[in-house]
């Protein structure tokens, strides 16, 4: 099948699954199976379409029969299709068993509509249609938040972003006479994109991507959402915002230097602040949401380095920045899916998202524990996992940036490398905190003490994603060259070599060699260790005698107290008169429903 046929089939499966899951919502288990199987098949078709185009290194165009509008699949947006497809596949399978919980509501309609709209946004050949599909996707996501109160901030900020994007589209139409992306690209080679339109687009799409300080909705939306929904927020919804920013920045191929510098600065702020705020959180989903912000910043660092390379006309910097950013985009979606779904499995058996109320889960849920350890290590960019591979290439782009001709670039290169290293250290601390407090030690509550293994499909989905994280790191030398086809600019092969992380992995592994030999050769010469109760100075061991998440984060909290105090200023919406009113949340929910219904009717009538 051609890539266009695969996409048509995938979108059709998503839509059919959404409708049927809604019709059978009176039977929750059956609705879950319909939504899960349909979503999994649609995701497989989506990933296959992206893989076909990426390996062929040639873009294709055609029509999406269901809505009757032109689409294009380039090697660049094929990476988004692969990301959406892989994550959607395992989230859909996981969602089948998720529906078995008594407190879970049917979500097949919203999840499959979200996936269909996201795919349509990725392949849109018209910027206006891109914005409309992204709007439908975001509205579906609003209804996946746990309640109207937590979704109202997302709705308010999302409508602001849509308004800015609508103004940007109107200005583009006035200036260039079209919103077709191919025509815009050709015309902008003669008349470059104005910085006013670019700023409107970056703010509008930045609200969707959660770039700090436009991130206010992110922790609220993730905190108490269902695990499949939270996973899709981070791996699908926010990544569409990044695609919009990159698309605008690459139009015409003549971006000014300050665009790239602005993206680099925003990326560094988002990465550092997101990692810092994550460390002081104890709700695991809110913590992971802040870590999503950190990784959005890291991806933006890579994309910003690529845009800076365009301005400086340095093909090597373009390749390193874009390839590193795109690879980390894929990798982040994989390991963040592991973490959200793994955290959801723990909630499924314990009813707790506060890690202070857990502990000892590793013995109760060993499969989920090991998969979560892999995901946390990937999040901390530890080798040989996929989180390390993408960041390593981004580090190389900073080294290349420090050797460029522009003074500001030479200044930023070392500073960004140091900033990313500090952010990585915060991620390692957060990994130790989450895994140590949640999965090690003694259970702190009866629910944690009585936890059992997660259901089969939930465990299989989490483990499969963890295996993908390992493959993404170990197979990076073979996967990274494939992404070079996604760089939409002619490159000079002699000047765009990427140092493969495998060499670095071997260098890091060398110090471990003596310990490996000792473990193999020790035999029975050393006495085996005996285990007993922990010694606590003559007192009986109590469950409270364990390190807490609050105590673990306290040194960092004290060291960065001035930065942490900015949280209220970075999210000043609570100061808006009437914002805390309960009626406003319900009003926004109804407005979102009306807007979603209108947009769906328009799209369906267009297809008919």
From Swiss-Prot:
Q: Which GO terms describe its cellular component?
A: formate dehydrogenase complex; plasma membrane
Subcellular location(s): the record lists: Cell inner membrane
Q: Give TM regions.
A: 10-26, 44-67, 76-93, 116-140, 153-173, 197-218, 229-251, 258-280, 296-312, 416-440, 453-476, 502-521
Q: Which UniProt keywords apply?
A: Cell inner membrane, Cell membrane, Membrane, Oxidoreductase, Transmembrane, Transmembrane helix
Pfam families for the chain: Proton_antipo_M (PF00361)
Question: Per UniProt, what is the membrane topology?
Answer: Multi-pass membrane protein
Q: In Gene Ontology terms, what is a biological process of this protein?
A: ATP synthesis coupled electron transport
Molecular-function GO terms, alphabetical: NADH dehydrogenase (ubiquinone) activity
Q: Which domain of life is it from?
A: Bacteria
Q: Which family does it belong to?
A: Belongs to the complex I subunit 4 family.
Descriptive protein name: Formate hydrogenlyase subunit 3
For this protein's source organism, the top of the classification is: Bacteria, Pseudomonadati, Pseudomonadota, Gammaproteobacteria, Enterobacterales
Q: Which gene encodes it?
A: hycC
